[in-house]
Structure formats: C-alpha cells, structure tokens
Amino acid sequence: KKVLLLITLLLTIFLSSCQKNELILVTTTSLDNSGFLEYILPYFEEEYDVKVKVIARGTGAALALGELGEADVLFTHDYDSEMIFMNAGFGEKRSNVMFNHFLVVGPEALNLESVELTFDYIYDNELEFYSRGDASGTHLKELSQWELFGYDVSTFGDWYQETGQGMGTTLSMASLDDHYTLTDIATFCAMKDTLEVEIAFEDVNELLNQYGVMKVNPDLHNRDDLNADLFYDWILRDDVQVLISEYKMCDLQMFYPNAE
C-alpha cells in the first residue's frame, strides 16, 4: 500500500508539473491551416519553456470550448462573437492582435467592382457556392455579407451548400467541385499550389479579417493561469508584433499587427 501511495503521489506531482509547463491555446482552423502557428509559437515556447497545446476549431466551436473552461487562451476572428463571450464573463481580457483579409475564390475571376456586386452576381446566376457552415469566423463573415446585401441564405437553392468543414478542406472541395467560397488569404496562400481556383474578388477594406486574443476566465478551470497571462502579454509585445509582420507567403505579408 505504501508503494502504491508513493506512486500515486509521484504521478500527481508529475502531472501538476506538466500542467504548469503547458498552455492550451484554442484557435481557428485558418491560423492552423496557414502555417502561422508553426511559425510563431516556437518563439514563445523557447522564451518561457512552455509547451503550447493547440486545438484548432472554427471560432464558434473555439468559443464553446472556452465557455467550458477547456482553454487557457482563445485566438479567434469574429469580434461580435468575442464580445458576447467577454460580456458573459467567460473571458478575463481581450485585445486585437492582427488583421488580414478574406477573398472570394472560385473557378473564374469575376472582376467586379465590389463585394456586393460579386455576391449579387453569384446569387443572380446561382453560381455553386460552398459555405463553411460551421459557425467559424469565416462562416460568420460570409453570412454577414449576405445579410448586409439583403439576402437570406435559408431561402437559397441547391447551388448553395454547407460543408461543415474547416477552411483547408472547404477550399479543397471548392477546387475539386468548381464552387465559389469565401476564404482567408493566409490559408489560400498556404494551399495555392494545390488548388485550381481563381481569385474572384479581393479587397482589404471590404473584407477585413480581424484577429483577437482572449484570456479565458480562470474561474472556469482549475489550471494555473500564469502561462495564459504570459502568452496574452507576449503576443501583444512590440517585438512579437514585428515577428507577426514578418510572416510571408505568396511573397506577401500575411498579417498586419494592430495590438492595442
């Protein structure tokens, strides 16, 4: 019995030690698919000797995990949903981190003057369109555009379909099936060489994609939240914001830092 108690005690100490050196970061599939996390996280892990456990989900699912206390930090991209999360007391603090933009891609470049004209054209001609359909930041952005231009997606015909998948899978499906879809530029650039799609519409101002970081309220879990504070402060630091600006794909800067 003494041996069993000793083993149990040592195991408890070991697991507690591992927990103190781990951070659970729940983030978006777009940041995961784009390769950005593989670029930026090693800097944090090396500086603080903390292992970051990444869980990639659509923003809606990421926020749900935060509400359950199954995350230390959230790194997402739908401001309205994030503020609902914060106002409900699930988050302790939030800040903007960086932005890029979305694109409409598909089998042909539509060359229209605005995102509204692009969505009008897709609707009027019933061009086959894949929606993420997963309550992700990208999905919510797409829905907000349809609503902004006076459309109700629940009335759309079979030309409009939901994939229920992440950004990478949805892009692959759009390429294979000659559908249009909305994507973030970083995931598109990461997968560009494997896709047979054209940029149908692109405009930084009209399709802005803002990313924010939130520290989950520590009352929702029983983990030490020191690492969450470390990461939150670190991602907003001037030198790390420079690192963010230096991440490039397609010979383009992928993210523009705007920490508050």
PLM features per residue range, with description:
Residues 52:
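Non-catalytic beta-sheet/beta-sandwich ligand-binding modules that flank or precede catalytic cores
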Residues 63-78, 82-96:
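Short beta-strand-centered segments that line the small-molecule binding cleft or hinge
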Residues 20, 49, 68-69, 80, ...:
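Extracytoplasmic
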Residues 18-47, 60, 64, 79, ...:
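Exported/periplasmic ABC-transporter solute-binding proteins
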Residues 6-14:
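Bacterial N-terminal signal peptides
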Residues 1-4:
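Bacterial N-terminal signal peptides that target proteins for export
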